């Protein structure tokens, strides 16, 4: 099975048409997942039951486990555990022009930068597209849920 966050629009259209559904129904899949932030097939309210059954035979919703959150004035660093036990870092940075999320594209790193926990681990593997998207959705969801978007940048570097 594949992480549903790795599913491209073109792949979804092909899957639907090969199984007798209209390709235009693909929009509801992506609205459910990315606009409505469904975290499971039961939360996909715009997608028909038949299409959800088809998807659930081939895909799963990847989940990241938060191991640790480190906070500073304008930065939140998340340590996530992937489904296979590998760890990755994701950083939310609040700046005067807005917020940005720095995601990991691999588990571990061979560079050895002192400021980065990933650099302390040997590279284990590259992440899938779904694992990268999951980082954005996890931190983005926390921004909305905890109203982090209303928190101003208050350090001197932002002024």
PLM region descriptions:
Residues 88-105, 110-159:
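Conserved Radical SAM active-site core
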